[in-house]
From Swiss-Prot:
Keywords: Cell wall, Glycoprotein, Hydrolase, Secreted, Signal. Expressed only in young (1-15 day old) leaf, stem and root tissue. Its EC number is 3.4.19.9. This is Gamma-glutamyl hydrolase. InterPro entries: Class_I_gatase-like, Pept_C26_g-glut_hydrolase, Peptidase_C26. It is found in: Secreted, Extracellular space; Secreted, Cell wall. It holds the Pfam family Peptidase_C26. Residues 1-21 form the signal peptide.
């Protein structure tokens, strides 16, 4: 019995000691925010020369993007939501540049953005071409005035920029490249500082040369020979990459401005990540998505170099957030979502 008393006493003493110890340790338990003195926390300073809230203007295209299934309104235009998502994935916001609004309104919106994107589509003449040409001219003027104002043009947008620079309406040639997944033949200039492909990881560049990671979806383009022998084009552009069509004919798939931050892509990176129509053959592999992201990162990194910092409220009043996207992909063709401007 005495032994039992001793054991009981020993047990309670041990338990009491443990409780005291636990209480003592509780005094030293900290939240993550309490681990450092606020004065001791420091972050690498951001580059004061860069604009970390860039805004991109995207030019709308005539129609509803769905052959009239979504809207037959006179003068309706659209932006495929995939272009908006592409820009946002790079860290920028979007202001729609409505192609048939007044020049005064367009100019006001251009004063709010740090770069422009020309989309794919079908319109090759009329008011749309006139507006695109005027915006392109103003973009070059912005650069001449000292602002770094990038332009990126996909598919039809790229072809129209080529036509505008060449000052020839018949400069383009027919190619069989509709809904064509493709690899790229990278030229030496692709390694140049400030080029699109310089932003790509080295392993992804290797994949681009062998795997079909980009989607071409056009019927016209320009051959390398024709671009190089046209003085206006060769003075303005250098070729970064070429591709072959279904007949084995080679066309320029990527080119960039020698003097200006202008990039022309005949392939459409936004479709890899954001378009799912069964009629397309867009690659959706992980590496194809990396191509989308790397292209977006490049373009928005260029836009951050723009010194234009407009009034924040004017920007907010013009953002595409003021509009709602419409689902147009129920038929499994065309764009999954579009923004309509009526």
């Amino acid at each position: 019995m005495p032994n039992d008393s001793v054991l009981s006493l020993f047990f309670f003493v041990t338990l009491f000691t443990c409780l005291l110890s636990a209480t003592s340790h509780d005094d030293h338990i900290f939240l993550p925010s309490q681990l450092h003195d606020d004065d001791s926390v420091s972050c690498t300073a951001t580059d004061p020369s860069l604009n970390y809230k860039p805004v991109i203007g995207i030019l709308t295209h005539p129609g509803d993007g769905a052959s009239g299934r979504l809207s037959n309104a006179t003068g309706v235009s659209y932006i495929a939501a995939s272009y908006v998502k592409f820009v946002e994935s790079g860290g920028a916001r979007v202001i729609p540049l409505i192609y048939n609004e007044s020049p005064e309104n367009l100019n006001k919106k251009l004063d709010l953005v740090n770069g422009v994107l020309f989309t794919g589509g079908w319109a090759v003449s009329g008011p749309y071409l006139d507006t695109l040409g005027n915006i392109f001219k103003k973009a070059l003027e912005r650069n001449d005035a000292g602002d770094h104002f990038p332009v990126i043009a996909f598919n039809l947008g790229g072809n129209l920029v080529i036509r505008i620079v060449s000052e020839q309406t018949d400069i383009l040639e027919p190619f069989t490249a509709s809904s064509l997944p493709s690899s790229l033949v990278l030229w030496n200039e692709a390694n140049a500082k400030g080029s699109l492909f310089q932003r790509f990881p080295s392993d992804l560049l290797t994949q681009l040369k062998t795997d079909c990671l980009v989607l071409h979806n056009h019927r016209y383009a320009i051959s390398p020979r024709k671009l190089q022998y046209n003085t206006k084009l060769s003075d303005f552009f250098e070729i970064l990459a070429t591709s072959g069509d279904r007949d084995g004919k080679t066309f320029v798939s990527t080119a960039r401005g020698r003097k200006y931050p202008v990039t022309v892509n005949l392939w459409q990176p936004e479709k890899n990540a954001f378009e799912w129509a069964t009629s397309l053959k867009a690659p959706h592999t992980e590496d194809a998505i990396r191509v989308t992201q790397s292209t977006a990162n490049f373009f928005i990194s260029e836009a951050r170099k723009s010194t234009n910092t407009p009034d924040a409220q004017k920007v907010r009043d013009s953002l595409i957030y003021n509009y709602k996207p419409t689902f147009g992909g129920t038929a499994g063709k065309g764009y999954d979502q579009v923004y309509l401007f009526e």
